[in-house]
Amino acid sequence: MESHSLTLDEACAFLKISRPTATNWIRTGRLQATRKDPTKPKSPYLTTRQACIAALQSPLHTVQVSAGDDITEELKCHYSAEVKPGTPVSHCRTAKDLSSLLGQRTKGRPQSFMTS
């Protein structure tokens, strides 16, 4: 197979991935690439077609996904800052907040409405 260099954009088009994904793959070691000028840290990456194919076929970085495996829900402590909508606690809080918003504003002391 021919071993000519691909730029990062060409490798992204070949792999059908975005440029940030390709850069992340290079940083994590999934895609083998070198800098055009290794002495400069901002030099563009160069890779080969074989390295791109190897990155797609690498079983080290692929994740097996199954719909029903390892479904676990963590039980969390329900405290006032973390209440799921629709629970009795949230209904009580909503009622209290609504009554405080709809109630008459008195600046901390009740006012009399009796007129003389």
UniProtKB/Swiss-Prot annotation:
One GO biological process term is: provirus excision
Quote the Pfam families the UniProt record gives: HTH_17
Give the Gene Ontology MF terms in alphabetical order. DNA binding
Query: What does the protein in this record do?
Result: Part of the excision complex necessary for the excision of prophage from the host genome by site-specific recombination at the att site.
- Keywords (A to Z) from UniProt: DNA recombination, DNA-binding, Viral genome excision
Superkingdom to which the source organism belongs:
Viruses
Which InterPro entries does the UniProt record give?
HTH_17 (IPR041657)
Task: State what protein this is by name.
Answer: Excisionase
